[in-house]
Each structure stands twice: as C-alpha cells, then as structure tokens.
C-alpha cells in the first residue's frame, strides 16, 4: 500500500501544468460508523484502495467521495487502517460504485463538465430488465421470452406455452425477488429460494407473488424459463467482463462461471454460490470439441453486446450474464454496470486486470 505522504504530495502539487488529473469514486460511506477508522465502504474498501493505488502510480489524484459542496467535494483517502477526510476540487471523471447515485448529484456534476465512467443510457438499460429486453430483441441474440406484467396478463397462455417460467422484479439484483413456476406431471410448483410448494390455483398464486414483489420493487416481469444444463445439481451461468483500457479500447477482460447452491433458482455468489472456470465446466459437460465451439460463441456474443451498447453510449465496463441450455444454446440473461470482482479470484491475472482497467479508463476520460 502506498503511504499517505504520496497522496498528500499529489494533492498539494495538483495543477494542470503538471498534467495531473483527478478521479472520484462515488460511494456513500457506512454511516453506522461514527469515525473514519476501519472499513467505511463495506465489502468495497479493499477494492477502492487498489483503485487509488493504481491511480497514484499513474499520476492521478484519486479519492472516494459522496458529498458535494459547490465546486468542492468531501473526499476520503486511505490512511493506516482507516480513511482520512479531505476537502478537494470536484473530480474530472467519476466512477460510480454506489447502488444509487442521487440524480441531483449526477446532474450537478454533469453540468460542470464531469465525465462519467459509465453513462446514464447504459446504466438505465442494465437497471431495467424490460428495457434491456427491448433493446436486445432487435438484434440476432438468444433471449428468453419476456413480458411486462399488467392486470390483463394472460396467465393461461403463458402456462400453456412454457413448462417453466419466472416471475421477477424489473429492477431486482443479486437474485432477489425471483420466483420460479415449474410444471411436473401436469402439476404446477412454485419455488422461492429453498422452498418449493405445490400450486393449487396458478392464477391466484401468481397474483399473490406479484403483490409480494411489488412491496419492494417497481414493475414485474414474466420470463420464459430456460431448460438449463445443471452442473453437479447446481444452476450455473457465465459472467463475462468487458472493459475499456487506458486508450479507450474495448477489451474482453475475462469470464468465469457462477455455480449456485444446489436446489436454488439462482447462481448468485451472495446466496451461497461459488466460482469456477467456465472452460472446465463446459469441457466436463460437453466434451473437448464442443467446449471450443461454446467458448468461441461466448466471446462472439459478448462482443456483439458490447458493440450494441457502445453504439448507444460508450461505456467503461459491463458484466454480461449468459445461460447455456441443455442443447448448448447460449442466452443473454442480463447485464450489470457495477460488476463485482470476487468471481475472478480464481484467476489472478484476470482479477488484476479487472481492478486496474477502471482507473485507467477514467484517466483516459479525464484527459479527453
């Protein structure tokens, strides 16, 4: 870890003539704490420290912030085992790592000419599964059939068309609020997390699920269930990380698979899942020859999605989630503009690149 004196010198000597540029990582502090010691940003403390260290090594002034005061902001930089509070000018580029940056703060920075690592149009697509579906369905990609719920939704039609379907929030994340309905020998079952129950009245049950989801989320989707290939009794998917580098060029940083806890609907790492190399899973399940074809298709699909998003608005990074069915067909499930890095701990080189590229691209934006 670079010493505090290095950060201090950068802050004191910051000026345009020295070609120093500032990058702000936006994330609200853990306000349950009454001081600046220890972890301030929950699971992201170590991530932020790596970003700041990489930025300093490239000559950038990097800090974490969440509060604005006119043309200044209250920032934090690592000091010892905690964080040191500083007052500094607003950054030239912002990397948002908070789940929800208030629109008034984003607007205030935007009017001052601040660049954003990931732009609003791409974030809006990632945060809304219905919007995402409508963007990508116009392109040659495999997508599960998706429909927005309304009071006139034809439950009979969907139950006749699919033996598996999901009821989920439009704007959910980390596997929250996802219910699956599956028909087994002409009997419907509803599953949420670890609990599966027989359904006597499908229409009534779906309506109650919709009411439950709407207590916490906005709109609700009905989505076709993919007959996924299971890996050791677990649902698995593929997370691809696409990022721009220090020259603003798109690169496929890497991809790995998330394997869910046996018996659960999702593969999310936050609900008991674990990471494994996609190549190992695919080879074990499909054999060496088909593995090569599937891996190549994963790459092609990821680049196709990247070009579509870039045509809407150039972005810094996106996580792409793909599912493989029992026939080896690959489906796009969702995209994420705040992808985690924990999945890439199993491959150190990929993890290192995944941590360094955001700050490098922020530097590119700050200087452009």
Task: State each model region's role.
Residues 1-16, 191-192:
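N-terminal accessory interaction module
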Residues 63-67, 221-225, 237-238, 311-327:
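A short glycine-rich, hydrophobically flanked beta-strand micro-motif that places a catalytic Asp/Glu
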Residues 159-164, 176, 183-273:
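Phosphate-binding site of ATP-dependent enzymes
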Residues 275-316, 324-368:
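C-terminal active-site "lid" helix and adjoining low-complexity regulatory extension at the edge
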């Amino acid at each position: 870890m670079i010493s505090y004196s290095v950060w201090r010198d950068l802050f004191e000597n910051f000026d345009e003539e020295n070609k120093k540029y500032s990058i702000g990582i936006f994330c609200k502090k853990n306000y349950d704490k009454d001081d600046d010691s220890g972890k301030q940003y929950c699971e992201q403390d170590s991530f932020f420290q790596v970003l700041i260290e990489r930025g300093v090594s490239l000559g950038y002034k990097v800090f974490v912030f969440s509060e604005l005061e006119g043309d200044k902001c209250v920032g934090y930089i690592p000091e010892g085992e905690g964080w040191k509070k500083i007052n500094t000018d607003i950054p030239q580029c912002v990397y948002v790592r908070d789940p929800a940056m208030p629109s008034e703060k984003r607007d205030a920075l935007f009017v001052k000419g601040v660049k954003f690592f990931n732009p609003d149009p791409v974030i809006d697509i990632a945060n809304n599964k219905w919007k995402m579906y409508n963007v990508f369905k116009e392109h040659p990609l495999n997508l599960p059939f998706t429909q927005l719920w309304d009071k006139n939704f034809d439950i009979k039609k969907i139950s006749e068309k699919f033996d598996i379907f999901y009821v989920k929030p439009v704007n959910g994340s980390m596997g929250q609020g996802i219910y699956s309905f599956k028909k087994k020998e002409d009997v419907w079952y509803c599953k949420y997390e670890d609990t599966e129950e027989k359904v006597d009245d499908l229409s009534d049950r779906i309506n109650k699920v919709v009411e439950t989801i709407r207590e916490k989320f906005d709109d609700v989707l009905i989505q076709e269930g993919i007959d996924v290939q299971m890996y050791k009794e677990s649902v698995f998917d593929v997370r691809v990380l696409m990022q721009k580098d220090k020259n603003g060029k798109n690169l496929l940083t890497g991809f790995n698979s998330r394997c869910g806890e046996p018996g659960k609907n999702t593969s999310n790492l936050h609900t008991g899942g674990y990471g494994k190399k996609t190549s190992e899973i695919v080879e074990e399940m499909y054999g060496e020859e088909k593995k090569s074809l599937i891996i190549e298709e994963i790459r092609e699909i990821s680049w196709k999605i990247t070009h579509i998003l870039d045509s809407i608005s150039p972005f810094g990074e996106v996580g792409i989630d793909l599912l493989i069915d029992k026939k080896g067909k690959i489906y796009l499930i969702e995209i994420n503009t705040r992808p985690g890095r924990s999945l890439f701990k199993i491959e150190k080189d990929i993890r290192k690149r995944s941590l360094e590229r955001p700050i490098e691209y922020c530097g590119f934006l700050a200087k452009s």
